[in-house]
Swiss-Prot record:
<keyword id="KW-0547">Nucleotide-binding</keyword>
<dbReference type="GO" id="GO:0006556">
    <property type="term" value="P:S-adenosylmethionine biosynthetic process"/>
</dbReference>
<feature type="binding site" description="in other chain">
    <location>
        <begin position="246"/>
        <end position="247"/>
    </location>
    <ligand>
        <name>ATP</name>
    </ligand>
</feature>
<feature type="binding site" description="in other chain">
    <location>
        <position position="271"/>
    </location>
    <ligand>
        <name>L-methionine</name>
    </ligand>
</feature>
<keyword id="KW-0479">Metal-binding</keyword>
<protein>
    <recommendedName>
        <fullName>S-adenosylmethionine synthase</fullName>
        <ecNumber>2.5.1.6</ecNumber>
    </recommendedName>
</protein>
<feature type="binding site">
    <location>
        <position position="18"/>
    </location>
    <ligand>
        <name>Mg(2+)</name>
    </ligand>
</feature>
<feature type="binding site" description="in other chain">
    <location>
        <position position="16"/>
    </location>
    <ligand>
        <name>ATP</name>
    </ligand>
</feature>
<feature type="binding site" description="in other chain">
    <location>
        <begin position="165"/>
        <end position="167"/>
    </location>
    <ligand>
        <name>ATP</name>
    </ligand>
</feature>
<feature type="binding site">
    <location>
        <position position="240"/>
    </location>
    <ligand>
        <name>L-methionine</name>
    </ligand>
</feature>
<comment type="similarity">
    <text>Belongs to the AdoMet synthase family.</text>
</comment>
<dbReference type="GO" id="GO:0000287">
    <property type="term" value="F:magnesium ion binding"/>
</dbReference>
<dbReference type="Pfam" id="PF00438">
    <property type="entry name" value="S-AdoMet_synt_N"/>
</dbReference>
<feature type="binding site">
    <location>
        <position position="240"/>
    </location>
    <ligand>
        <name>ATP</name>
    </ligand>
</feature>
<dbReference type="InterPro" id="IPR002133">
    <property type="entry name" value="S-AdoMet_synthetase"/>
</dbReference>
<dbReference type="Pfam" id="PF02773">
    <property type="entry name" value="S-AdoMet_synt_C"/>
</dbReference>
<dbReference type="GO" id="GO:0005737">
    <property type="term" value="C:cytoplasm"/>
</dbReference>
C-alpha cells in the first residue's frame, strides 16, 4: 500500500439489484448441489420491475423447485410488498435454464477425478494483507461492515424506516502502508417516504457509521456523505436492473488487488473462475498469516480441459521475508492447484454458496453449517491452517 496515500473501496447491500441476482444464482446452485454434489451449474439471473429471469446451463440428476427458490430469496432479503417496489410473492419468474454443452463436459470430466480439467481458460487472483485482523484491505472491509450493519438495523427494527437497497464507500488514508485515518464515508440507503432527512442522517450516523468505523480513525476533516442526493425511496429492481456477476470488485478486494474478470455466483466448483479464486485467497492468506510477507498477491491461470495450471506467479510488493521466487516454490510444494485438488482441499462440494453472495466472498469467518443431513464448514478458504507448515518450510 505504500504507493497510495488514499484508497477507496465500495460495497453494496443484499438488497442491491445486482446482489439480489447473485444471491438467486447461488441459491439455485445450493439447491442443486444439495441433491447432486457433482452437478455442473452455471446460473445467471436478471431482476427488474416485477420479474426475475434465471438462465444458464446445468447438467444434473437433481430436481429442484426453481420458482420457489427465487421467490424465497427475494422475500428473505425484504422485498415483500409493492410498497417497497418489489414483491417476491407476486413477481413473475421466468426459467430459461438449459443443458450444459457436451463439448465442455468432455473437456472437464475424466475417469480419474484428480485429472479433472479446468472448466474454462482464465486467470484468477488471490490477495491478503496484514492491515486488518481478517487479513483484508481496510477500505473494502469497512465498506462491507457498513452495509451489513444497515441490514441488521433494518431487519431488527432498530431503524425501521430503512429499506433493503444500500451502498457504501470508504476512503482510507495510508502512511507507510498502514491505515492512519478514514477521510471519507459515503452511505446511501433506501428508506420509506415518511422519515425526515434529519432523522435519517442522525440514525445512520449514530447506529451504523459510528458503530462500524473505529473512532480513532475519524478526524475533524472526515467527510460524511449520508444519502447525499436527499431522498432514496425508489430502489431495488425498480430503480435499477440487476444482473449476476456485476459486482466482482465488491466480491473480492475492493480494487486493491487485480481481478481476472470472472464472476463467482451461480458457478459450481468445477469452474475455476470461482474455485481457483478461492484457492488464491487461501494461499495468499496463509502466506501473510505465516509472516512470509505483509502483502501477497498470487495469480493462477488455466486452459480449458487441462488440470495443471498454465502459470503461477506471485508478488509480495517488497514486503517478503523471502524472495518471491522462493515463496512460489513453497506454494508449489504445499498447495495442489489442480481443479479437483482445490475442490478437495477446500471441501467445496456443499451447499454453502448463497452465504457468499453478499458482503464479500473474502474476509469472512469459517462457519459450520447444516443443510438437511449435510454438515460442513463454509468459507474454508479463510482458514490459516497451512501457516505453520509454510513458516517451518521457510525456516522462519
Amino acid at each position: 500500500m505504500s504507493e497510495y496515500s488514499l484508497f477507496t473501496s465500495e460495497s453494496v447491500s443484499e438488497g442491491h439489484p445486482d446482489k439480489i441476482a447473485d444471491q438467486i444464482s447461488d441459491a439455485v446452485l445450493d439447491a442443486i448441489i444439495a441433491e447432486d454434489k457433482y452437478a455442473r451449474v452455471a446460473c445467471e439471473t436478471l431482476v427488474k420491475t416485477g420479474v426475475a429471469i434465471i438462465a444458464g446451463e446445468v447438467s444434473t440428476s437433481a430436481w429442484v423447485d426453481l420458482e420457489d427458490i427465487v421467490r424465497n430469496v427475494i422475500l428473505d432479503i425484504g422485498y415483500n410488498s409493492s410498497d417497497v417496489g418489489f414483491d417476491g410473492a407476486t413477481c413473475g419468474v421466468m426459467n430459461i435454464i438449459g443443458k450444459q454443452s457436451v463439448d465442455i463436459a468432455q473437456g472437464v470430466d475424466r475417469s480419474k477425478p484428480e485429472d479433472q480439467g479446468a472448466g474454462d481458460q482464465g486467470l484468477m487472483f488471490g490477495y491478503a494483507s496484514n492491515e486488518t485482523d481478517v487479513l483484508m484491505p481496510a477500505p473494502i472491509t469497512f465498506s462491507h461492515q457498513l452495509v451489513q450493519r444497515q441490514a441488521e438495523a433494518r431487519k431488527s427494527g432498530l431503524l425501521p424506516w430503512l429499506r433493503p437497497d444500500a451502498k457504501s464507500q470508504v476512503t482510507c488514508r495510508y502512511e507507510n502502508g498502514k491505515v492512519v485515518g478514514v477521510d471519507a464515508i459515503v452511505l446511501s440507503t433506501q428508506h420509506n417516504p415518511d422519515v425526515s432527512y434529519k432523522d435519517l442522517r442522525e440514525g445512520v450516523m449514530e447506529l451504523i457509521v459510528k458503530h462500524v468505523i473505529p473512532a480513532h480513525l475519524l478526524h475533524k476533516d472526515t467527510q460524511f456523505h449520508i444519502n447525499p442526493t436527499g431522498n432514496f425511496i425508489i430502489g431495488g429492481p425498480v430503480g435499477d436492473c440487476g444482473l449476476t456477476g456485476r459486482k466482482i470488485i465488491v466480491d473480492t478486494y475492493g480494487g486493491m488487488a487485480r481481478h481476472g474478470g470472472g464472476a463467482f455466483s451461480g458457478k459450481d466448483p468445477s469452474k475455476v473462475d470461482r474455485s481457483a479464486a478461492y484457492a488464491g485467497r487461501y494461499v495468499a492468506k496463509n502466506i501473510v498469516a505465516a509472516g512470509l510477507a505483509e502483502r501477497c498477491e498470487i495469480q493462477v491461470s488455466y486452459a480449458i480441459g487441462v488440470a495443471q495450471p498454465t502459470s503461477i506467479s506471485l508478488n509480495t510488493f517488497g514486503t517478503g521475508k523471502l524472495s518471491d521466487d522462493k515463496i512460489i516454490k513453497l506454494v508449489r510444494d504445499n498447495f495442489d492447484l489442480r481443479p479437483y485438488a482445490i475442490t478437495t482441499m477446500l471441501d467445496l462440494l456443499h451447499p454453502m454458496y448463497q452465504a457468499t453472495a453478499a458482503y464479500g466472498h473474502f474476509g469472512r469467518t469459517p462457519v459450520e453449517m447444516t443443510v438437511g443431513d449435510d454438515t460442513f464448514t463454509a468459507f474454508t478458504w479463510e482458514k490459516t491452517d497451512r501457516a505453520d507448515a509454510l513458516r517451518a518450510a521457510a525456516g522462519l
